[in-house]
């Protein structure tokens, strides 16, 4: 498979991971809304710690591993249905499941604007990290570039959620995003050398608040 020139790869990543790409990411907080409600995240420092934990040892790390596995299987004609089923099984709550599956299906539909054989190899209902990873691989985009952009978009979406929840303002948000760049790059490097045996995590509080959010009385987000 021929790799895309870096300029084309950059343009595609900017389009696919833009807030304007129609996957509905603005509707999800990944449990952050409940963490704010419970006082676990209250300012820029606690928000940074929360998001770093997700990517180092929580759902963000698992998504990175699954992204890489999907990228590799897209490149070598591997079984994408298997990794898609695993990713779905790892969604630990009803709302986390909806968040990843609905965004994945929306991404698959929208990415049809860039025709590629990998689209037909993905199940119609597929976790977001698997869909993006496989389509990036199928389009010849370098793994670490694609995953770094995916992780930074993950940070960006949750920082935007934090703004709407009143935790940080615009200036603090941009400072946080700039500060997350080294973590996105180092995590992409680490995950690029991972296998499915590296799946796992210990961000249990994040998983608990994702479940608690299902019964939260007043809320802005779907997760």
From Swiss-Prot:
- Asked if Kinase is a keyword of the record, the answer is no
- State any single GO MF term: nickel cation binding
GO CC annotations, alphabetized:
cytoplasm
InterPro entries attached here?
A: UreF, UreF_sf
Its main subcellular localisation, reduced to a broad class, is cytoplasm
Keyword Coiled coil on entry: no
Its subcellular locations are:
Cytoplasm
Superkingdom of this entry's organism? Bacteria
Similarity comment text for this entry: Belongs to the UreF family.
> What is its quaternary makeup?
UreD, UreF and UreG form a complex that acts as a GTP-hydrolysis-dependent molecular chaperone, activating the urease apoprotein by helping to assemble the nickel containing metallocenter of UreC. The UreE protein probably delivers the nickel.
State what this protein does. Answer: Required for maturation of urease via the functional incorporation of the urease nickel metallocenter.
The protein's name is Urease accessory protein UreF
């Amino acid at each position: 498979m021929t790799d895309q020139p870096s300029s084309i790869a950059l343009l595609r990543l900017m389009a696919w991971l833009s807030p304007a790409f129609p996957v509905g990411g603005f509707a999800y907080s990944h449990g952050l809304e409940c963490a704010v409600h419970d006082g676990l995240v209250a300012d820029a420092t606690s928000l940074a710690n929360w998001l770093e934990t997700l990517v180092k040892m929580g759902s963000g790390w698992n998504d990175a591993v699954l992204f890489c596995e999907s990228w590799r299987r897209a490149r070598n004609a591997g079984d994408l249905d298997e990794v898609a089923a695993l990713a779905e099984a790892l969604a630990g709550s009803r709302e986390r499941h909806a968040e990843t599956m609905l965004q994945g299906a929306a991404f698959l539909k929208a990415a049809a604007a860039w025709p590629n054989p990998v689209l037909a190899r993905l199940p119609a209902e597929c976790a977001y990290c698997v869909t993006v990873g496989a389509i990036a691989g199928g389009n010849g985009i370098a793994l670490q570039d694609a995953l770094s952009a995916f992780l930074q978009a993950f940070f960006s979406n949750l920082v935007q959620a934090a703004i709407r929840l009143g935790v940080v303002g615009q200036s603090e948000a941009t400072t946080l995003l700039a500060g997350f760049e080294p973590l996105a790059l180092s995590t992409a490097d680490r995950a690029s050398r991972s296998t499915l045996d590296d799946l796992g995590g210990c961000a249990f509080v994040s998983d608990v608040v994702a479940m608690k959010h299902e019964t939260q009385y007043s809320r802005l987000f779907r997760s």
